[in-house]
C-alpha cells in the first residue's frame, strides 16, 4: 500500500508544528512503520535539529528539485530508528526554489518506499504552505490557546477546505 502523506501545519509560527512532526514520526517508526519526514520550511529549517540529524546533512530538498542530487542521496536515516528518515529543507535558498508540483513529484516518488510521509509546513499561508499541502492526503493543524493562533488555524482550515 502506498504511503499516506500527512502535512503538519498552522497559520502561526511557534505553536509546535516541527515538534509535533518529529514526535508523530518517532511514534510511527517505533511501531515498525516506514516513515520519511520532509522539512518544507525552506530557508528556516529546524526539523533536522529537533530530530538530532543536523550534522548529517549532505543534500537537501532543493538539491533534489534542482537536479544536484537524487532523492535517495538526500534521505538521512535516523541514528536510533532504522525506519525513520528525513529529507531536510535548504537552509540558504529562496522559498520559490520549490513548487507545489515539485512536492507532489517528490511525494509520489517516495510513496512506494514508505508507509508515511510527514511534511513539516512553514508558518503562514504563502508559498511554503501551498507546497506543503499540495501532495497531502491528510492535514494536521497545530495551534495553541492564543487568540491569534486559533484565528490563524481557522483561516488555514478554510484554505484547505477550498482546495
Predicted region positions:
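P-loop/Walker-type NTP enzyme "switch/lid" segment
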Residues: 37-112
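Conserved catalytic-core segment of NTP-binding enzymes
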Residues: 101, 105, 109-112, 116-163
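Flexible glycine-/small-residue-rich
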Residues: 10, 39, 88-91, 121, ...
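Conserved NTP-handling cores and scaffolds of large molecular machines
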Residues: 28, 32, 42, 54, ...
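Residue-level recognition of oxygen-bearing side chains
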Residues: 20, 70, 124
Amino acid at each position: 500500500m502506498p504511503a499516506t502523506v500527512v502535512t503538519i501545519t498552522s497559520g502561526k509560527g511557534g505553536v509546535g508544528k516541527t515538534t509535533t512532526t518529529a514526535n508523530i514520526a518517532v511514534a510511527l517508526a517505533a511501531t515498525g512503520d516506514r516513515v520519511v519526514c520532509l522539512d518544507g520550511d525552506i530557508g528556516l529549517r529546524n526539523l533536522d535539529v529537533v530530530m538530532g540529524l543536523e550534522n548529517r546533512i549532505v543534500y537537501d530538498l532543493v538539491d533534489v528539485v534542482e537536479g544536484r542530487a537524487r532523492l535517495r542521496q538526500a534521505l538521512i536515516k535516523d541514528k536510533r530508528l532504522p525506519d525513520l528518515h528525513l529529507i531536510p529543507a535548504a537552509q540558504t535558498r529562496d522559498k520559490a526554489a520549490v513548487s507545489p508540483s515539485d512536492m507532489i513529484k517528490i511525494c509520489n516518488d517516495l510513496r512506494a518506499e514508505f508507509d508515511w510521509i510527514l511534511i513539516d509546513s512553514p508558518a503562514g499561508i504563502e508559498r511554503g504552505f501551498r507546497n506543503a499541502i499540495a501532495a497531502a492526503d491528510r492535514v494536521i493543524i497545530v495551534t495553541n490557546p492564543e487568540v491569534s493562533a486559533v484565528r490563524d488555524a481557522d483561516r488555514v482550515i478554510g484554505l484547505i477546505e477550498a482546495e
